[in-house]
Curated annotation (Swiss-Prot):
Family membership noted in the UniProt record: Belongs to the SPATA2 family.
Residue ranges of the region described as Disordered: 233-257, 270-299, 313-337
Gene Ontology CC entries for this record: cytoplasm
Organism: Bos taurus (Bovine)
Protein name: Spermatogenesis-associated protein 2-like protein
Length: 409
């Protein structure tokens, strides 16, 4: 099935839904299944759809320590872009759809949290939007209907691509890996199984990942986002928002529960009448009590810092002092944080690839415990054999300091 045939089927799906009173993204399960099957076998279909898949996926995933929440954020962003194109195609006379606020609503909470500003502007330019000022995008001239359908179909395909990549990570058993390796494996494979096998071989070699730039975490769950209105308008109005549903009430499930459905579930369920908008799962944040007890980021290990640590333990290295009177008694020492430990996934002498500052454990890149460890934890990649050896030595020294009995005077 060629791109022109897919575009026609997609157009018929949108118009069929409009006759049913719903102007939203495509929710046809048969079209979704067909497009999924073609995309899995041929990544190059994205080129025929002209959806800039490689540039958008690379931009959205690059620098992310955990690719699973990044994919959820990207899927949400592509869904919002698809909806913007669908609105212009089905309802071109609606003036509210011709202006997009770039300082509030879904643009800030969903789009800018997943993609760079330059690529967002390029995506909206395909729909006929131009930057009017620093705060608004406006439709200068409405593109042909065929072009709007093509843009919306491309965003639909990008949503399915996020689903395919999510399935790869689910079968792989970990989502902590470099984005470029995931995309390279996806482009070189013809199905999910071969992509997973390729990545398993790469992880088994434990090759050193390339350095990744720092990047903030994806935007978490937000209630009732709108591309076209201000925050004040969103909060003060109970009218149907861009997504066709009222804002969640006090009896609605929490954002955490609302995020439980898997992000690749069908659009009909995500966008059905009366249902709240689906949002990506938010990286869990510590409560106020936990944040007060949060430990500072540990410094990079060196033997100088080890010496300072040893010298700070007078009970082990210094002779005992004469007992003091109660008036002269010093305050009790502040308990030290526990040392770093080697997780059981690491064989004796094996170099760690990841460090969890919350659990204070070192892991291998393919550790099976990572999916249950990393949500909400401070997980970082150890780059370079020299850094990995230093952390291995630190864990060995910590084992001596904290596990063995204190030395006598």
């Amino acid at each position: 099935m060629g791109s022109s045939s897919l575009s026609e089927d997609y157009r018929l799906c949108l118009e069929r839904e409009l006759r049913r009173g719903r102007a939203g993204v495509c929710g046809d399960p048969s079209l979704r299944a067909v497009l999924w099957h073609i995309l899995v076998e041929d990544f190059d279909l994205h080129g025929a759809l002209q959806d800039d898949a490689l540039a958008l996926l690379t931009d959205g995933l690059w620098g992310r320590a955990d690719l699973a929440p990044a994919l959820r954020g990207l899927a949400r962003a592509f869904e919002l872009l698809e909806l913007a194109a669908v609105h212009l195609y089905l309802l071109p006379w609606r003036k509210e759809f011709t202006t997009i606020k770039t300082f509030s609503g879904g643009y800030v909470h969903v789009l800018k949290g997943a993609l760079s500003e330059d690529l967002l502007i390029q995506s909206f330019q395909k729909m006929g939007y131009v930057r009017r000022d620093a705060h608004r995008l406006m439709v200068a001239a409405l593109p042909p209907a065929r072009q709007l359908v093509q843009v919306a179909l491309g965003c639909f395909a990008l949503r399915l691509e996020c689903e395919i990549l999510g399935e790869v990570l689910a079968q792989l058993g970990t989502s902590v890996l470099p984005a470029e390796e995931l995309l390279q494996a996806r482009r070189a494979s013809v199905d999910v199984a071969s992509c997973v096998a390729w990545l398993q071989q790469r992880l088994a070699r434990e090759e050193e990942p390339p350095p990744l730039p720092r990047r903030g975490s994806p935007t978490g769950c937000q209630a009732r986002l709108d591309l076209y209105r201000d925050v004040q308008e969103d909060e003060g109005s109970d009218e149907a928002s861009l997504y066709g549903g009222p804002s969640p009430g006090p009896d609605s499930p929490t954002s955490e529960l609302a995020c439980q459905p898997r992000f690749w579930e069908q659009s009909a369920r995500l966008w059905g009448a009366g249902g709240g908008p689906w949002e990506p799962a938010e990286v869990s944040s510590p409560t106020s009590g936990a944040s007060e007890e949060e430990e500072p980021q540990p410094e990079a290990f060196s033997f100088l810092s080890l010496r300072r640590e040893l010298l700070s333990r007078p009970g082990d290295l210094a002779p005992p002092h004469a007992p003091r009177s109660p008036e002269q008694a010093s305050p009790p020492p502040i308990p030290e944080p526990p040392g770093y430990q080697m997780h059981t996934c690491l064989a004796p002498g094996a170099l760690p690839a990841l460090c969890c500052d919350t659990c204070r454990q070192l892991h291998a890149a393919h550790c099976a415990a990572l999916p249950s460890c990393h949500p909400g934890h401070s997980l970082r990649t150890l780059r370079g054999n020299s850094q990995r050896r230093l952390w291995l030595q630190r864990a060995q020294v910590d084992a001596l300091l904290y596990d063995s009995p204190a030395a006598g005077p």
